[in-house]
From Swiss-Prot:
Gene for this chain: spuA
Enzyme class per UniProt: hydrolase
Membrane topology category: Peptidoglycan-anchor
Species for this entry: Streptococcus pneumoniae serotype 2 (strain D39 / NCTC 7466)
Subcellular location, record wording: Secreted, Cell wall; Cell surface
Protein name, entry field: Pullulanase A
Amino acid sequence: MRKTPSHTEKKMVYSIRSLKNGTGSVLIGASLVLLAMATPTISSDESTPTTNEPNNRNTTTLAQPLTDTAADSGKNESDISSPRNANASLEKTEEKPATEPTTSTSPVTTETKAEEPIEDNYFRIHVKKLPEENKDAQGLWTWDDVEKPSENWPNGALSFKDAKKDDYGYYLDVKLKGEQAKKISFLINNTAGKNLTGDKSVEKLVPKMNEAWLDQDYKVFSYEPQPAGTVRVNYYRTDGNYDKKSLWYWGDVKNPSSAQWPDGTDFTATGKYGRYIDIPLNEAAREFGFLLLDESKQGDDVKIRKENYKFTDLKNHSQIFLKDDDESIYTNPYYVHDIRMTGAQHVGTSSIESSFSTLVGAKKEDILKHSNITNHLGNKVTITDVAIDEAGKKVTYSGDFSDTKHPYTVSYNSDQFTTKTSWHLKDETYSYDGKLGADLKEEGKQVDLTLWSPSADKVSVVVYDKNDPDKVVGTVALEKGERGTWKQTLDSTNKLGITDFTGYYYQYQIERQGKTVLALDPYAKSLAAWNSDDAKIDDAHKVAKAAFVDPAKLGPQDLTYGKIHNFKTREDAVIYEAHVRDFTSDPAIAKDLTKPFGTFEAFIEKLDYLKDLGVTHIQLLPVLSYYFVNELKNHERLSDYASSNSNYNWGYDPQNYFSLTGMYSSDPKNPEKRIAEFKNLINEIHKRGMGAILDVVYNHTAKVDIFEDLEPNYYHFMDADGTPRTSFGGGRLGTTHHMTKRLLVDSIKYLVDTYKVDGFRFDMMGDHDAASIEEAYKAARALNPNLIMLGEGWRTYAGDENMPTKAADQDWMKHTDTVAVFSDDIRNNLKSGYPNEGQPAFITGGKRDVNTIFKNLIAQPTNFEADSPGDVIQYIAAHDNLTLFDIIAQSIKKDPSKAENYAEIHRRLRLGNLMVLTAQGTPFIHSGQEYGRTKQFRDPAYKTPVAEDKVPNKSHLLRDKDGNPFDYPYFIHDSYDSSDAVNKFDWTKATDGKAYPENVKSRDYMKGLIALRQSTDAFRLKSLQDIKDRVHLITVPGQNGVEKEDVVIGYQITAPNGDIYAVFVNADEKAREFNLGTAFAHLRNAEVLADENQAGSVGIANPKGLEWTEKGLKLNALTATVLRVSQNGTSHESTAEEKPDSTPSKPEHQDPAPEARPDSTKPDAKVADAENKPSQATADSQAEQPAQEAQASSVKEAVQNESVENSSKKNIPATPDRQAELPNTGIKNENKLLFAGISLLALLGLGFLLKNKKEN
């Protein structure tokens, strides 16, 4: 640790005064300290400004970038991990003042003011609302463990005339028969002898339990039920210390935690069971997750328990109870596992399955004793056996349950449920593998229809006119077929008056248990023009109408699978994500387009840009039919800034998995045109040597009814009681169910076979079971062997309640090499991400663990195990959240309206892009990431902050380090409901180097990086063993000035052909020096492929931002480089000249004077080689391959003996000449002064020793 001058001075005075013989030693020791200071192994120019560039001979001036208002006039956007209203601030519950921490060891039990204490041996029953108005005519009839069971029905009940009232409602106290009392049974009746509530009972969970509550539906609880739409989280600590204890929560809640992590909601309100927080819930909430936090701690220790809590029974409970760091979530305030039945399903002809709140401690004989099953006639059905699944919290009853047409009634104690027909039973009885959908034949003269709906009583097809989708032509009944199918053939005999069915529309009319619905064919191949604004008109408009089409006859007939350039395996892919409308909605290119903007056809006109950039695959945001949009207005440009209520959509609200949306068609009213136009787009992508990846959304639908109307309680994952599970407002498709899995696989096969696509990206893939995704992959690869699949592998699997299975998430990667997942670990460490988005990360000045960064760069993320580099999608930006440019601005708190800040943001952006494109695995680029795309809300009315009720939806208000808002401070994240003004791809910024030099420089930089990546296998290694053998960390933490957490990294890769590459990144705000030692001395002979201004596959003649030093390599602030040493130890010919800026640039900064940088000293040539020992990260890296050792040795010798003339032939001059090109750091002068001081101190030390020797 460096001492302060005053501290050092004090120590020295004490030493001279107190010691004689030690004085010389102190001086000699001081000289050694100074010697060490004179020879640092990694140095920093601490005063170097962030935007420093090398002091070139030809200094130019950088023009301030044009403001977006010159080219923009439009609207705004949105967010994935939070609901559409995530912009709202976290609601604070009105809470009682917090009391001082108590040392009590049990929860607070203060009674409600209006409530009298409960006498010993009494049990209080609270009633929210009496069944009838006349309380005097109602009573509580009791039996079981009460002192005096009620007698003389009905008048022998405890009369509510004597009931007392509190804040909740009425209550009566019942005397128990003694301490052994365990069960209190009761009902509310009236004097007329009517049982008003049905039989109820409550089990005493613990001896001290002395009250229970009935809600308005007369369900029994061990706590006071909360108002609808609220859950209370109670937290009891035995130490009484609630200081800085808080809750971080998400899920089906109105306002998920969204403050800066880990600033959760504090436990401040005090209640009967410790502290509590009331959380408002979404409508029909089912589950939420949370973390208990201790904000007095740091890092991961802030979590009281490291694992997420998840509560999935919000339908049945409005309070939960937590205790200390107990892993359990209790549904009673006594912290015991309360066995309650929560649902029942008919799962097979010999089995019924019931779900329970818990089965901890449950015994088979007790379950049998307290269970009862009756059929629809009320007759008891014998239970022959029970199987208890404690982990799954379910009991399977065995018996004769062969009646599959009617429900059964299952009861356990006072809990009673009517069975729902489970998907298991439907799979066992009705699963079908034949052809489904509408098959148009005989030149349109015939249509074969097949629909699967086993519970339907009747099915008809309603046919609509081809020129007027609202006009009914006629209705034809379908006939019941095998295994739950309904079939019909439409032709001239159906009396519809149609000779050619092509282009006509249809829906299915399904009658079931007296209810009729109109449903969309899930296998429809095209649709009528869709307008979700009409959904409320009637049933015919709440879902789209399918169209009779023959896709095989539409579009280019020569369409085939793509032959993708520079691509053999998934590690070779460079994926570029784009939205069809965004790519051509910029009004700046309106005159250049010959086709309507925002369409498949217009996209074709800009494909050459992507070909020139060098990407291998274009990933299109969802192009299949989505719900919330008006396709009839797709031609209207949304030029005003808006971030809500826009006729715009990303497409993550699917309506059909076979039909394309009409939003990107030149004529949405023509159901054939969208098919032909999309085929043409794929064909043109293939002609340019690129592939097409479709973003698909099988994890949820836009509306639950889309599939529930087809077959209730089947297509979705189910809760334990048999109701469908939801997500984002729609249903979670249950891909473990046979017909749902079939739908997914059939859809994938159809899209590959019909449109010849080259891959799929699965939205929220972790919501699916791994088996279904694997099956889809194999089916698709059987058609297109070059196809790739990737997905969001977040751990979000819900599945059917209490039926765990292997999910298609990040944890699956160690078991498969078929599908890849996005790495949030590299994203979060390089630029930040949920829940810490906007906090400084590696490329934005936040120090990060160097080993963690290195592991991510070699496709070994720290939060999941990848057994192949191809398992990992390397990315730092996607359509979700803020763009990369915007998140950098937010993180460094610098307003891009200032030219110097704009340039700095781009420097950091280029660092991030370089790290992703030189990483192992598969790189992924968000459209516009290459040029610095922004979604800044540049409406003149929003140039400064506005009132809270005027804040744009899904926006962040950005401020600088002083707290001042940016110019136009609102930036939109998740722009799925924003206008074209917000979402457009800005072609001027991407291509006009004169108006936007920084943007075009960044774009060209990425183009060069892609070319570099594709020029060698070094960055595309195919196995972990290859990576282990060929990639070595240079910047080992704890050595050579590299800290454990730092903002620099350097590593070396040996390509399969023997070429050696090295990547160095300095994300610091000052220059940093990298010590190469002996192990990496051969890099001195390298050519530079990337510097601070450009990148490519050939050497740069005059690289900028770096210089060789005697210890190694020095990089300017915010600079990265890629080096290459060819196989034979000589560099490739350097041909890339440094391109002059397209506009005059800002004057270069001169390095500060030496005295301003006392620690920036250049290593001296006389330092022993012992300080340059090899240092590498992997265990086997201490021994280089013999050829590499020989090469390193020869390269080092060559560097030491190289003449100036010879070095000038390389692309980096030798050190003497280099000083003329790069800023003079003053290091030599500093070294001379230091060594003079060292010599003087050493002489003084010797003098003291000699003097003392004589005196002694």
